[in-house]
Amino acid sequence: MARIAGVNIPTNKRVLIALQYIHGIGQKSARDIVTKVGIDDARRVNQLTDAEVLAIRETIDKDFTVEGDLRRENSMNIKRLMDLACYRGLRHRKGLPVRGQRTHTNARTRKGPAKPIAGKKK
């Protein structure tokens, strides 16, 4: 298994698919990396040479924010919104949908399981 950006990449998959196992790299980013390094899309990870794996590593380190750094950046952005006490920050703080979805019905994923109200019958 090749280890890139702290993630063990599956060896039997194609390079494009295997790179997407890294948090922060999707289809387009994986394709950009492969073209920049000059690797064929159809090649599998176990067919890569050490030099190619090293080139992929360097490209990712230089051009992309991935894994822990990306997670930290996202959480810091949310924390900043909460500290500003703007509308989006308040919605994050209350655990409600942030992007304008309705909450009268639905939004159960964000709000958690329904809480029973005492004295109310169906």
From Swiss-Prot:
Gene3D superfamilies: 1.10.8.50, 30s ribosomal protein s13, domain 2. It comes from the Bacteria. Residues 95-122 are annotated as: Disordered. One of its GO terms (molecular function) is rRNA binding. InterPro entries: Rbsml_uS13_C, Ribosomal_uS13, Ribosomal_uS13-like_H2TH, Ribosomal_uS13_bac-type, Ribosomal_uS13_CS. Pfam families: Ribosomal_S13. GO terms for cellular component: cytosol; small ribosomal subunit. Keywords: Ribonucleoprotein, Ribosomal protein, RNA-binding, rRNA-binding, tRNA-binding. GO terms for biological process: translation. Belongs to the universal ribosomal protein uS13 family. Located at the top of the head of the 30S subunit, it contacts several helices of the 16S rRNA. In the 70S ribosome it contacts the 23S rRNA (bridge B1a) and protein L5 of the 50S subunit (bridge B1b), connecting the 2 subunits; these bridges are implicated in subunit movement. Contacts the tRNAs in the A and P-sites. Part of the 30S ribosomal subunit. Forms a loose heterodimer with protein S19. Forms two bridges to the 50S subunit in the 70S ribosome. HAMAP family: Ribosomal_uS13. This is Small ribosomal subunit protein uS13. It comes from Caulobacter sp. (strain K31).
